[in-house]
Regions:
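Conserved Radical SAM active-site core
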Residues: 25, 40-123, 128, 132-133
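Short glycine-rich, flexible loops that bind phosphorylated cofactors or substrates
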Residues: 84, 148-149
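N-terminal pre-triad scaffold of radical SAM enzymes
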Residues: 14-37
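Single conserved hydrophobic/aromatic residue that forms the stacking wall/gate
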Residues: 1-13
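P-loop/Walker A phosphate-binding loop and immediately adjacent motor/lid segment at beta-alpha junctions
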Residues: 94-99, 150-185
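Short, conserved loop/helix-junction motifs that constitute active-site signature segments
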Residues: 132-135, 158
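Receiver (REC) domain switch/active-site residues of two-component response regulators
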Residues: 138
Length: 185
């Protein structure tokens, strides 16, 4: 298992394969650094932007290798917070590479920010690369984890306020479109 965080232009990450954070068998990239600090966060150690190890070209190559087998459905970004502005800037070149080299793989991301916050020009989470980063995703699970709304029956979410967004359909229609689990079984 690896770990990494974004430090300046570096990112520290942890990676592993799992089936709990998106459809199918996935490679999970844990991005360090988070200012949301949700109560009872399941990964509070990843709030630190320096947690884990630096994201290097060797790490990137290893993730591409891990993503390559046919039985791997795709990549999931977790945190920490992938949509911290400095994390967005560091993730963008890697996600471009995943799309270029492995176009058949899906990319999911979890964020404590809402879709609306990511599109609000005055919001902390929005930066010059947010739109392109979102355009590279298939699914975004948005919203802060709210302990009072925790529900173990929810698939791919920790609390009922979080939404599973079909990013391509949302961008194409201009209307927030939830991911249809039944259509993706």
């Amino acid at each position: 298992e690896m770990s990494a965080s974004l430090v300046g232009s570096e990112m520290c990450i942890r990676d592993s394969c799992d089936i709990a954070n998106g459809l199918g068998v996935r490679v999970t990239l844990f991005v360090s650094g988070c200012t949301n600090h949700c109560e009872n966060c399941f990964q509070p150690q990843t709030w630190d932007f320096c947690y884990g190890k630096p994201f290097t070209s060797e790490t990137e190559d290893e993730l591409i290798r891990l993503l390559s087998p046919d039985y791997i459905n795709g990549l999931t970004l977790l945190g920490g917070e992938p949509f911290e502005p400095k994390n967005q800037r560091a993730l963008l070149p890697f996600l471009r590479r995943v799309r270029r080299e492995l176009p058949q793989k899906t990319i999911w991301s979890f964020t404590g920010f809402t879709w609306e916050e990511l599109h609000d020009p005055t919001a902390y989470s929005r930066c010059e690369v947010t739109d392109e980063l979102l355009s590279l995703l298939d699914v975004l699970v948005d919203g802060r984890y709210v302990d009072a709304l925790h529900d173990i029956s929810l698939r791919f979410r920790g609390s009922s306020n979080q939404r599973i967004i079909d990013v391509p359909k949302t961008l194409q229609s201009g209307t927030l479109t939830l991911w249809d689990e039944r259509a993706n079984i």
